[in-house]
């Protein structure tokens, strides 16, 4: 049998589309055009209006600042944020998050988890009745 000497082609990642629109198309749209595409929860947030803090975060993103830190976990990820890295506070520290196209119209807080899984060790001396008789090391 003859061996195949062809190189494997790297897998091409399909271009992300949101409800039939590419990220570039979404970035060109005005907010009034984006509202019908958003899920209901995000649409309600924009209908009620953004707070000053949310407006300031969007202004910082538009200005091109590299280091953006925020406590605004309830901010909706807009198409203009794609490709940027934002540090989101999780209650203890800031976690750096790279905004991917798949994250559009999700909340920032979904990507900086506030709880960590607890890995309990073995019981210590006196933790239970049976551990009273465990010899010390």
UniProtKB/Swiss-Prot annotation:
It comes from Methanoculleus marisnigri (strain ATCC 35101 / DSM 1498 / JR1). The gene is rps19. One of its GO terms (biological process) is translation. GO terms for molecular function: rRNA binding; structural constituent of ribosome. SUPFAM superfamilies: Ribosomal protein S19. Belongs to the universal ribosomal protein uS19 family. Coiled coil: none annotated. InterPro entries: Ribosomal_uS19, Ribosomal_uS19_euk/arc, Ribosomal_uS19_SF. Protein S19 forms a complex with S13 that binds strongly to the 16S ribosomal RNA. Pfam families: Ribosomal_S19 (PF00203). This is Small ribosomal subunit protein uS19. Keywords: Ribonucleoprotein, Ribosomal protein, RNA-binding, rRNA-binding.
């Amino acid at each position: 049998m003859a061996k195949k000497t062809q190189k494997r082609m790297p897998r091409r990642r399909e271009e992300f589309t949101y409800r039939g629109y590419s990220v570039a198309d979404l970035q060109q749209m005005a907010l009034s055009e984006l509202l019908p595409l958003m899920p209901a929860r995000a649409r309600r947030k924009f209908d009620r209006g953004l707070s000053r803090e949310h407006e300031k975060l969007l202004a910082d993103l538009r200005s091109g600042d590299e280091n953006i830190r925020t406590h605004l976990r309830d901010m909706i990820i807009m198409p203009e944020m794609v490709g940027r890295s934002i540090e989101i506070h999780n209650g203890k520290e800031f976690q750096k998050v790279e905004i991917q196209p798949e994250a559009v119209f999700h909340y920032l807080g979904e990507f900086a988890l506030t709880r960590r899984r607890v890995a309990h060790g073995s019981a210590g001396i006196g933790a239970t009745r049976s551990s009273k008789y465990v010899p010390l090391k």
